[in-house]
């Protein structure tokens, strides 16, 4: 009921004393890199404490969400190209082009007479296409991390908490028992 009434508390709703907010800005072309960036304007903005390069983009740390978002947009980024095909129409064309005669008659099993069976069969042909649909959870994607001496607490919407725990253990050097997701 809480989700349908807007009363659900998510990780993004967490507030702690001394908390800073980080946001990211990544290449709009899937898989594209970051050739370079100019963060001078963002670094001059009130409340911004850091602008850092990350894989495929930048991260901005600020004292509140609004300032982090504004600073991320103020960073001038030189984006690299994507190694992937751009839109659904191009993707469908690439898949269609991959259907070559090289594998047209390959079979794992060759039993019976297909041509004879098809002569008396009713044939239904159809083609269905749908665009890519990203996983879109109701919870805003976010993570809140609190690192204290020998303990790491993590609040996030995840379907794989063991993965989060293992990766955070590798990053922090903490034992799994000291990491709470």
Annotate the PLM regions:
Residues 1-181:
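Structural alpha/beta core scaffold segments of enzyme domains
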């Amino acid at each position: 009921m809480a989700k349908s009434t807007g009363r659900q508390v998510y990780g993004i709703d967490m507030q702690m004393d001394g908390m800073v907010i980080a946001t990211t800005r990544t290449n709009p072309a899937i898989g594209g890199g970051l050739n370079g960036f100019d963060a001078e304007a963002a670094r001059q903005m009130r409340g911004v404490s850091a602008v850092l390069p990350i894989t495929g983009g930048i991260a901005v740390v600020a004292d509140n969400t609004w300032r982090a978002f504004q600073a991320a947009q103020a960073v001038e980024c030189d984006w690299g190209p994507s190694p992937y095909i751009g839109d659904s129409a191009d993707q469908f064309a690439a898949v269609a082009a991959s259907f070559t005669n090289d594998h047209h008659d390959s079979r794992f099993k060759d039993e019976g007479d297909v041509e004879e069976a098809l002569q008396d069969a009713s044939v239904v042909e159809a083609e269905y296409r749908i665009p890519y649909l990203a996983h879109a959870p109701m919870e805003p994607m976010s993570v809140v991390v609190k690192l204290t001496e020998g303990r790491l607490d993590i609040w996030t919407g995840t379907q794989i908490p063991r993965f989060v725990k293992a990766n955070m253990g590798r990053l922090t050097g903490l034992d799994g028992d000291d990491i709470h997701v």
